[in-house]
Every structure is written in structure tokens, then in C-alpha cells.
Amino acid sequence: FSDKMIETANKNLLQSGRRNISFRVMDNLKMDTPDNYFDLVTARHTIIDPLQIYKTLKEGGQLIVRGVDKLDCWSLKRMFKRGQAYHDVKPISLIDYEAIMDAGFKEVELIPLHVIEYYKTKEDLYALLVKTPILDDFSEESFNEYERKPIEKKTFEKYVKQNTTEKGIK
């Protein structure tokens, strides 16, 4: 995914005419950049090391984190009685927030986003579930190894039936 995303970002950058922007793929837990290097670091759906990011940001630089919250896809997790952060006491967003504050960031906003996505077909929803860790049973609090379980057909069909709307399956 990352190489393709960078390719798309570079195409968009070319169209924008801006010259002071570059994109890189790297391990966010082993960043290979000097201190005070970035104006902006973004992280989406990933584990972050806020202390390392803090060191790589220029003075006045910004960090934007968009992560999966405990309540993301909650109705699905409830139906299957498992899933990413299902058993966690703290939501992932709060875990990240505390780590960011501990790293030295001063102006921090925690803005919960809860988006309802709709899928045209049950095949589309199923494809998402087998490619993402939504129903994988693991804890964001303890970072334990997660267990990939098969998606039970009967439970999946029940979910589809209960969550099909005129907009699609939510």
C-alpha cells in the first residue's frame, strides 16, 4: 500500500505546483531522519513512537494522528464478541493521547471521529474484514500478539441482515 500511496501523493504534488514537499515511506518506530527535520508528521492507523516523532519535528512542527478507536465498527465487534481493542478498558485514542503528552507535546487536541461507512454488497464488506484487523482479537493496551480467527458465516450473514439499509451495509 505505501509505495502506491507515495506514487499517488507525488502525482498530486506535481499537479499542485508546490516544491517544498516530499514524501517518504519508513518504519515509524525507527525513523531515519535527523532531529528537527519535519514540519509535519502524519500517522494513520499505525502504532507511533511520539518521543521519536517529537525529536524529528522542527520547532512549531505538527503531528497529526488518525487512528482506530475502540468504538470503530463497534456493532460488528459486538456481534462477533471480539475485535481490535474490544476488550481494552482505555480507547486507543486515549492511549495515544497520553503517550503524546508524555513525549513533550504541549498543544494537543483529541478529536473523536466516528464515521459510518456503507458497503454496496456483502462481498465488499467481507473483503474489508479479511484484509483488515477489525475482527482480529488483540489488545491495543497491551500490544499482545493477535489471533486471526475465521469469520463465522452464520454471524456474518446475521450482521448483514441486521445492518442493510437503502444506503448499503453499514
Task: Tell me what each language-model feature is.
Residues 106-170:
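Conserved Class I S-adenosyl-L-methionine
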Residues 6, 49-51, 73:
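Short, well-ordered alpha-helical microsegments
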Residues 41-42:
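Hydrophobic beta-strand segment of the Class I
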Residues 62-94:
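Conserved class I S-adenosyl-L-methionine
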Residues 48-64:
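A short glycine-rich, Lys/Arg-flanked "PGG" loop and its adjoining helix->strand segment in the class I
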Residues 33, 85-116:
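Active-site capping/gating segments
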Residues 1-31:
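Class I SAM-dependent methyltransferase SAM/SAH-binding core
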